[in-house]
Amino acid sequence: MLATDSDPIVAIATASGRGGIGVVRLSLGRAGEAAARALSDALCGARLMPRHASYVPFLDGAGEPLDRGIALYFPAPHSYTGEHVIELQGHGGPIVLQLLLQRCLDAGRAHGLRLAEPGEFTRRAFLNDKLDLAQAEAVADLIEASTEAAARSAGRSLDGAFSRDIHALVDDVIALRMLVEATLDFPEEEIDFLEAADARGKLAHIRERLAHVLGDARQGALLREGLSVVLAGQPNVGKSSLLNALAGAELAIVTPIAGTTRDKVAQTIQIEGIPLHIIDTAGLRETEDEVEKIGIARTWGEIERADVVLHLLDARSGLGPGDEAIAARFPDGVPVVRVLNKTDLTGAPASVTRTGGGAARADVCEVRLSAKRGDGIDLLRGELLRIAGWQAGAESVYLARERHLIALRAAQAHLARAAEHAEQNAQALDLFAEELRLAQERLNSITGEFTSDDLLGVIFSRFCIGK
């Protein structure tokens, strides 16, 4: 534990700006009950009763009221952080909150009270076993959720749904490890522990459950991160019109003049709760205009970072030499949707054709639509969801992060190797046991049983101050 993890800390816990209510939160660490009594007297002029709401004045150093509000005292360990906690709930003006914060620091100086770092309250909740690491991350995800679906999924993670699934997997792996260790520890016995206990069947069951958890986690990661979708193509094929149609608002300027869009225009929309970060880019062509060249260079940068590329073509001319040259530069591994726009000028109906694209672009499809009239926009939305791998109506989804997916995939790989060793019977039992141990270690890293201080620092530094 870091030396600073036991310092008394204080921070404004509500968002900056004006509001009806503002909260200053103190977690008293090693200073404990003595500091709670002293600060209650100094700040509120009264001894606060545990778990009672007291309407009191908040006093300055001269004993004059700065504000009046609700004071709450939660003795350890029955608090958010597991330490003695005081919350002062007053009016949400930025000046009065800063005055109250400074008053807390002055009154608590003798106890070593300092300003909290970002995420430090939740870090202490984790260190004091009030939350595991996945639940702690869910606190930040709930605050930052950009859609209702993301908020509900973060709530499920905070409630422990993700952690319970991980703990169940770990328990199963531990039980299987015990069987393997028993066989290794008693090689002279004629009993085949693995065969008698159906170890291979148990391993198959664990792998099946892990695949299900990974599927839910992928869905949750989609809700959290969303999908970056770049509109690319030659000038004047309707990229800005398509952005406006997808967003349902006039965000980009649309003119018949080629090269109108010289820099990216970005907008986040929602489809079934998934944030789609749509990026309209400069038209791709040879040009001598220096400003347009900069925009085109930025377009290729956005394409390199995209999750999906929408390659727009004019439905009247289809795929021409210029379009083929553009398509040849798209990075491998990035799904490309070929969008033939302006079907209102050809009379062709809106449609979807799944074309495939080889191993590198297995999700490639072709959508014919009219961004101007809105024909086929729903078809395009459906294809984006399909490419993302979204399964509508998934009630068990919990929000997940990239580090969770990495750990789950690593555990999956270790269990796959364990299955290979299990087929070799006694000749590879030690390797079987080691792969199970490594799988358990990767699963435990999700909930924080085996986690370095460096990783904790990165995770909690991304929280807001006061949480």
Swiss-Prot record:
Mg(2+) binds at residues 240, 261. Pfam families: MMR_HSR1, MnmE_helical, TrmE_N. Keywords: Cytoplasm, GTP-binding, Hydrolase, Magnesium, Metal-binding, Nucleotide-binding, Potassium, tRNA processing. Binds 1 potassium ion per subunit. Its cofactor is K(+). (6S)-5-formyl-5,6,7,8-tetrahydrofolate binds at residues 25, 87, 130, 467. It comes from the Bacteria. Residues 226-389 form the TrmE-type G domain. Its EC number is 3.6.-.-. K(+) binds at residues 236, 255, 257, 260. GTP binds at residues 236-241, 255-261, 280-283. GO terms for cellular component: cytosol. It is found in: Cytoplasm. GO terms for molecular function: GTP binding; GTPase activity; metal ion binding. One of its GO terms (biological process) is tRNA wobble uridine modification. Belongs to the TRAFAC class TrmE-Era-EngA-EngB-Septin-like GTPase superfamily. TrmE GTPase family. Exhibits a very high intrinsic GTPase hydrolysis rate. Involved in the addition of a carboxymethylaminomethyl (cmnm) group at the wobble position (U34) of certain tRNAs, forming tRNA-cmnm(5)s(2)U34. NCBIfam families: mnmE_trmE_thdF, PRK05291.1-3, small_GTP. Homodimer. Heterotetramer of two MnmE and two MnmG subunits. This is tRNA modification GTPase MnmE.
